[in-house]
């Protein structure tokens, strides 16, 4: 499936925007909200990434372009050890691309489906790492709104990383959100009763953390909610159902989960300090957590892809527009567009042209390089000013 077979890495202009030709496509590994995901290698640095690609025409037809743009906007401003971070975004005539951290440990949903039994100490560390990620998002005024095992990836050492910001929301200060979005079994009670006057805030992500932690420990969720369950039934369930906790779990873990699964958002644990100050976490070295120096109790199997192998078959056999045939397809498409003059084709092209114009190109390497250069220039300028001040002082003393 590789796009480049040459042993000699091509030379790219440093000032050129990163594009599809800068990567070697290795294999498909999954599906995102609006597209598919594959492993890629950057030709110049040989670094490995995950590349998510979204077909523009499908996004236009499903009215999903704005969601993609919003996700890009949010991810460009984020960087944290327990997030899946964006490195590049670019486009061609057919697709929009997001190149992110490659995490080969699989998502937590995959491991649950493989009947992995997560021990309490493992889940305890997961809670700490995810709490640090949520605290960072909160500091950036971001609500994820879709925290669940499917959107938590493991790296090769077993540390967790939050991904998929497709329905995340930016929350201006002194405001609350009223729009309903998320995956029902993980949505907080206040999201189902949200009104314009009340709304909801960051606490919804901490409820999702509680549901996820419970599910990892028990293999099922605390409430029997499905995507087909009506909002009315869910509200009634929150008011009447009693969450049970196995006797094998420590009382400290049960107490923590109860704080996260508190129906009243004002009383729910919803800050990192709530977790840090909880007696159960008194033995936790939080600097070591942030620096990933604590060894998780579950480490994904090395030497294998922790994902559904059918994704590769879909890409190679079933996919109507496989990525490895992109160049030929784009050349053919250009010829067909020149021949076609139907009003429907013209309208679609107008929308695609708008996407092309408004798409946000991003290069984290360049952003970091520019920042480091500015810092170096400032340091040089400061040194120069200090030297001049010292010389002026010496002259004044003469």
Curated annotation (Swiss-Prot):
PROSITE patterns: PROTEIN_KINASE_ATP, PROTEIN_KINASE_DOM, PROTEIN_KINASE_ST. It is a lipid-anchor. Its EC number is 2.7.11.1. A lipid is attached at residue 2 (N-myristoyl glycine). Its cofactor is Mg(2+). GO terms for cellular component: plasma membrane. SUPFAM superfamilies: Protein kinase-like (PK-like). It catalyses: L-seryl-[protein] + ATP = O-phospho-L-seryl-[protein] + ADP + H(+); L-threonyl-[protein] + ATP = O-phospho-L-threonyl-[protein] + ADP + H(+). Residues 379-398 are annotated as: Disordered. Keywords: ATP-binding, Cell membrane, Kinase, Lipoprotein, Magnesium, Membrane, Metal-binding, Myristate, Nucleotide-binding, Serine/threonine-protein kinase, Transferase. CDD domains: STKc_Yank1. Pfam families: Pkinase. It is found in: Cell membrane. ATP binds at residues 29-37, 52. The active site is at residue 146. It comes from the Eukaryota. Gene3D superfamilies: Phosphorylase Kinase, domain 1, Transferase(Phosphotransferase) domain 1. Belongs to the protein kinase superfamily. Ser/Thr protein kinase family. This is Serine/threonine-protein kinase 32A. The lineage of its organism: Eukaryota, Metazoa, Chordata, Craniata, Vertebrata.
């Amino acid at each position: 499936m590789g796009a480049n077979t040459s042993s000699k890495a091509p030379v790219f202009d440093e000032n050129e925007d990163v594009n599809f030709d800068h990567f070697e496509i290795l294999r498909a590994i999954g599906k995102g909200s609006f597209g598919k995901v594959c492993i890629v290698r950057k030709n110049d640095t040989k670094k490995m990434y995950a590349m998510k690609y979204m077909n523009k025409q499908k996004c236009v037809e499903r009215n999903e372009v704005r969601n993609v743009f919003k996700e890009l906007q949010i991810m460009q401003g984020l960087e944290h050890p327990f997030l899946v971070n964006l490195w590049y975004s670019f486009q061609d005539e057919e697709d929009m691309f997001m190149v992110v951290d490659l995490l080969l440990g699989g998502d937590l949903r995959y491991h649950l489906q493989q009947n992995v039994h997560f021990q309490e100490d493992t889940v305890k560390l997961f809670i700490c790492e995810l709490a640090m990620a949520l605290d960072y998002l909160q500091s950036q005024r971001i609500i994820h709104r879709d925290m669940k095992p499917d959107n938590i990836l493991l790296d090769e050492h077993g540390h967790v990383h939050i991904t998929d910001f497709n329905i995340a929301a930016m929350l201006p200060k002194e405001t609350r959100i009223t729009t309903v979005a998320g995956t029902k079994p993980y949505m907080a009670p206040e999201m189902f009763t949200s009104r314009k006057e009340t709304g909801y805030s960051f606490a919804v992500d901490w409820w999702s953390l509680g549901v996820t932690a419970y599910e990892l420990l028990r293999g099922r969720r605390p409430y029997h909610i499905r995507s087909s369950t009506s909002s009315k039934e869910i509200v009634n369930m929150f008011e009447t159902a009693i969450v049970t906790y196995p006797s094998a779990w420590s009382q400290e873990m049960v107490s923590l989960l109860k704080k996260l699964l508190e129906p009243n958002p004002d009383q729910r644990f919803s800050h990192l300090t709530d977790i840090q100050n909880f007696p159960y976490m008194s033995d936790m070295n939080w600097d070591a957590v942030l620096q990933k120096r604590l060894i998780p109790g579950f480490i994904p199997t090395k030497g294998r892809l922790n994902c559904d192998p059918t994704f590769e078959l879909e890409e190679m056999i079933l996919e109507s527009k496989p990525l490895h045939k992109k160049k030929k397809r784009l050349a053919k498409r250009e010829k067909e567009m020149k021949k076609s003059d139907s009003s429907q084709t013209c309208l679609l092209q107008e929308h695609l042209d708008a996407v092309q114009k408004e798409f946000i190109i991003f290069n984290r390497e360049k952003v970091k390089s520019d920042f480091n250069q500015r810092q170096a220039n400032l340091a040089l300028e400061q040194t120069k000013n200090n030297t001049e001040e010292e010389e002026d002082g010496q002259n004044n003393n003469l």
